[in-house]
Structure formats: C-alpha cells, structure tokens
Amino acid sequence: MLLTYMEVHLYYTLPVLGVLSWLSRPYYTATDALKFKFLTLVAFTTASAWDNYIVYHKAWSYCPTCVTAVIGYVPLEEYMFFIIMTLLTVAFTNLVMRWHLHSFFIRPETPVMQSVLVRLVPITALLITAYKAWHLAVPGKPLFYGSCILWYACPVLALLWFGAGEYMMRRPLAVLVSIALPTLFLCWVDVVAIGAGTWDISLATSTGKFVVPHLPVEEFMFFALINTVLVFGTCAIDRTMAILHLFKNKSPYQRPYQHSKSFLHQILEMTWAFCLPDQVLHSDTFHDLSVSWDILRKASKSFYTASAVFPGDVRQELGVLYAFCRATDDLCDNEQVPVQTRKEQLILTHQFVSDLFGQKTSAPTAIDWDFYNDQLPASCISAFKSFTRLRHVLEAGAIKELLDGYKWDLERRSIRDQEDLRYYSACVASSVGEMCTRIILAHADKPASRQQTQWIIQRAREMGLVLQYTNIARDIVTDSEELGRCYLPQDWLTEKEVALIQGGLAREIGEERLLSLSHRLIYQADELMVVANKGIDKLPSHCQGGVRAACNVYASIGTKLKSYKHHYPSRAHVGNSKRVEIALLSVYNLYTAPIATSSTTHCRQGKMRNLNTI
C-alpha cells in the first residue's frame, strides 16, 4: 500500500510523539524547554544542509506524488522529520534519565589521568573516523551515503564526549536504553516507508547490504548515530544544568538564573559549565549532598522513591530540606544523649540558623564551620552545609518554628487542648509545608505575586495540619507504646485515659474509644482538606503531580482508618500496589478519592513521621 510521507507522520511518528508528550507533561520544566529549543535548532539547521547535500547527489530519493511540497531538494515532510525525531528522542531520554539526580554522576574525586584517557581515546577514534569518512564520501560511489553519515555525526559525538563522556559512562544502562528504543522504533518506521515506496535509498551510493528486508545498513547507522547524538546532547545539558544549579550562588534577591537570563546568556553559561572537568568542581559540595541523600534514603525509602516524580532541581532541594529536618530531629530525639546535651545542640541549631540568615550569600563558606565541627556529628554538618544552598529560598521564621516543635518534644510538654494541638502541628508540619512550598515556588516559570504567594503558603500550612492530624490519628497506640507520648488533646480524654496512654497502655482504653478518637481527628483533617487542597492548582505545573501524589498517598491512610469499625490497627497501612496506583494516577491528575488532597507538606517522625510512611 502506497503511503504518502505525511501519512507516515500522521500514522506513526506523531502519535508516538503525542504519547511521549502526554507522559512528560507533569514533569515539563524550563530546562526541558531549553533542551528542546536548543537541540531542535541545532538538529534542524545542520540536518537540513546535510540532507540537501545527499539528496542532491541522489543517495536518498522520494516518491514525487507522496510529498506535499519540496524546499530546496528536500520534501517538507523531511524537514518535519528532523524536528519530530529530535523531540521524540529527547522526550524519551528525559523520561529515562529523570529518576536519578544528575549531580550524583559528577565525580570530582576521579583521577585526572583516568579522565584524560576516558576522554582522549574515544575522541581520537571518532575524529579519525570522521576524517576517513570525509575522504571516502565520493558522490556516486557505494560508500558515499554511509561515509556522509559518519562525517556528519562523528565530530559532534566527539564534542559531546568531551563534555559529558564520563558522566554518561556512569549511567550506561539509561544511555543505552535511551538510544536503543527510539532507534528501533524509527528503523521500523523506515522499513514501513521504504516497503510502501514513500522513499528509497540508492544502490549506487550505498553498500546494498540490509539489516532486515527494506532496512539498508546505512539507514540503521543513520538512526543509531543521530539518536546517539541526541541522547549525548541531552546528557550534556543535564550535566551542565546540574553544575549550574549547584555552583551558581544566589542571593536572597536573585531568582533562579534560567528565569532571569536570556536564551543566549543561558547558552553561554551552559557552554562554560560544559567545558568544566569534574576535577575543578568543589568535591565537598558533592560529598555533602551525597550524605544528605543517604540520610533521606535511610530515614524514608518511600519518600526517597516518591520524590522522583519532582523535577531534578526541585527534588534535590526538597531532599536537602528533608535531610536538614531529619538531622536536627535526630539531634533532639537521640535517647542515648543526655537531655541537657540535646537542649544545647538545639540552641546550637538556632545559632546556625541565625548565622545563615545573617549573611548575604548562600555559599556554605560564609559560615564558621570550625565552631560547629567540634559540637555536632559529621553527618549533621554535611546536612547543614547542603542546607545553606536554600538560603535564597527560605525564610528564617519557618525554620525557627520547626525548632520550637523540637523544643516542645524535648520538654515533653503535653497537648492540653485543641489550641495546643494546632500549635504543635503547625510547628512540626506546617513549617515544613511552608518551606517545601517556597522551594517549589522558587522554580516557577513566572513569579507569583506576594499576595498569591502568601495564599498558597497558607494552603500548604493547612495541608501540614491535615497530614499531622492523620499521622497522630494513625499512631495513637504506637506513640503510647514506643514513646510514652499522647499527642491527642487531653481535654478529649479522662485523667485515666491520659495516664494509660502516657504509660504505654493505650490499648486498655478500648478499641471503640481508640477508633472514636482517631476518627474525630481524621474528620477534622477532612474539613481542613477542603480548603487546603485548593492550593495545588496554583503551584508550578511541573510540581503539581509530585505534590498531588505525595498528599493523596498519605491522605489515603485517613481513608483506611475510617474503614475500621471495630478494631483500631496498631499502624494503618496502605499496600504498596495501592500506593503506586494512587501516586501514578495523581501525577496525571486522574485520581479520584473520597476526599481530594493536594499541597506541599511533609512532616517528621513523631514530628516527622509523615515522610517515613508515604
């Protein structure tokens, strides 16, 4: 059956591109837009000239009645193909690469000689190949088409290997998958089109060898090499953006650089970062970040996994925030350390916050770390150093509010009434929700007004209450047995019930009573949720899916608790498969729950327990 070139796009390439675009939509960021614009511009301009050259020399031909128009020597649909292929491969590569932080594949500690060899050997081989191919590309000869492909692709591959070769070698599976699947798909489209007579490859300028019927080896080589160029280009941009994100210092008054710089300025900065070898980068920065993420990974595997649905730069900063919260929480919760020592460490943390917000830069070198090194654990110091990079985003008030929550627990103060419950929950949960929201809003494509920012933050703080109330409702027995604590308002309880719960005997107040208390708290959370979940729609679109997923998964615990009628579970739990289902549907805004949830809050164990059970 004869296919027109436009039908090839309508039936094959565009539907797949549409699916990839839909899958990528929740994660689409300004960095992705930059990738698409830059790589498409380069691919289109270079491929247009190259393709006109080979068509002029009759290496590739098309059915004259199968195209809508010809520009130069090349059909309009072929120009479309350059753009579609670039968008398709880059979109797929983004989906494959996004699940790990790009900065983890930059290694300043790598020996210089190793880096020189890893760069020099492939670059030399690629340039020699390009040189020989240039001289073999004689029009009308069997090696013409294949040689043209090699001299076109190999110099670009050499350049990209110079800037990102080691980075890509550290994630080989992701790179290979990103190259292989688009290549196989486009080869299949090529087989269909050649078989249908849409276009053809001249036997006079090719070897006449086929990988499979209707797939000349030159066509396979073209798709494999050009997809390799596109994947290498995507990885190179990922690496440069990771470097810029870590090493471009920001003042409290400076927005993220990609929002305030022109396209040309961004390209110039990226060129600078592209040329930097790993060894000139500050290794302590990567060490501190790695330690912070180890804290996150060990403390909450669930949140570590769930954070993958956020864009890389947002995910990195949320992870740093979590590590700081966890590290400071551990300072106050470590029962092996005397209470007085923990109180002194809390005072020290207050001093760190004052020092941090008393400076005019986010650079960790502005802090006198020798003062803290002698009094805090090494892991805590690393978390603090990474946290300094959030100086330009956060405000001191929310951090100090969180520290007030730690003080409440250190003093083992009781929650006497509803007002105490709200105050404590605001300290340990709303404060974190506010900080998460400020991080997310800092990565918005367009800055929100002051009034709108305050409204969104208020919704996030309310969501903090929702999640903390759910947390307390779920852990009445656990808090009693493990901590000897009662986080329920004491004016909800009799003196005997308070004594039983604080004595580790919460079960003895009865199953129905436990259910009644937990449901009462959940229903309060439900009422707050009605207003709190409105904030999500005002967040940057590329973060809404992640926030929605995290909150919906946690709110499902409240739904689970309400399903119990006769027995209060020690720890209500939503199964892994159900959590995955809720998270995936939430990312694409397809999840419908009894109570819709959204916002940007995570809480700590006993204080931060929410994050540990997502």
Swiss-Prot record:
Domain of life, per lineage: Eukaryota
Function statement: Bifunctional enzyme that catalyzes the reactions from prephytoene diphosphate to phytoene and lycopene to beta-carotene via the intermediate gamma-carotene.
Segments for region (Phytoene synthase): 246-614
The keyword Mitochondrion is annotated on this UniProt entry: no
Keyword Oxidoreductase: no
Subcellular location: Membrane
Catalytic activity: all-trans-lycopene = gamma-carotene; gamma-carotene = all-trans-beta-carotene; 2 (2E,6E,10E)-geranylgeranyl diphosphate = 15-cis-phytoene + 2 diphosphate
Taxon lineage: Eukaryota, Fungi, Fungi incertae sedis, Mucoromycota, Mucoromycotina
Signals that turn on the gene: By blue light.
Protein name, entry field: Bifunctional lycopene cyclase/phytoene synthase
Metabolic or biological pathway: Carotenoid biosynthesis; beta-carotene biosynthesis; Carotenoid biosynthesis; phytoene biosynthesis; all-trans-phytoene from geranylgeranyl diphosphate: step 1/1
InterPro entries to which the protein is assigned, alphabetical: Isoprenoid_synthase_dom_sf, Lycopene_cyclase_dom, Squ/phyt_synthse, Squalene/phytoene_synthase_CS, Trans_IPPS_bact-type, Trans_IPPS_HH
Impact when changing residue 409 to G: In strain: MS36; loss of phytoene cyclase activity
